């Protein structure tokens, strides 16, 4: 069920090696963009988080996507151009962040599931709680959003500034992909990507058995 992808930074569509840091093309499909985000740092609100776990959500063909039933006021940001934020309220309290992908109108995005706070840790601690261990500060979509200081008003904001800033893609030697978690539809799609053995990854049960 799981696939271990060993990379010298691969472009999944063209299967060609990428060497060094390179800008990410957010107009590509979410499934292509998602693994490229691993290792990148997203900065906002005085905090920088190195992304370690993501999930791709596709267009209206993906029953688990917020865009499955079409465009609404709540998910309108997902139908914007790639490279912009889509923030929604989860379980009535958490702010979960997604980066929109694909051409405008396609309704694709990548959910930011987990990461490591690499700058502004004192700010993230104040937002999350003074006694939260470092590895858990941005572990899980809601915690990621809280540590980063996400609000619904951040919808449509570009990840290229001024409020957000995403670093270029980086070399990631190994990436694991498997089913998304916390959903009830399209559960077998291998659209969750994470850095193996990273302590910040949220879906511990998603690791392959050794």
Curated annotation (Swiss-Prot):
Belongs to the DNA glycosylase MPG family. Keywords: DNA damage, DNA repair, Hydrolase. One of its GO terms (molecular function) is alkylbase DNA N-glycosylase activity. It holds the Pfam family Pur_DNA_glyco. This is Putative 3-methyladenine DNA glycosylase. It comes from Corynebacterium glutamicum (strain R). One of its GO terms (biological process) is base-excision repair. Gene3D superfamilies: Methylpurine-DNA glycosylase (MPG) (3.10.300.10). NCBIfam families: 3mg (TIGR00567), PRK00802.1-3 (NF002003). Its EC number is 3.2.2.-.
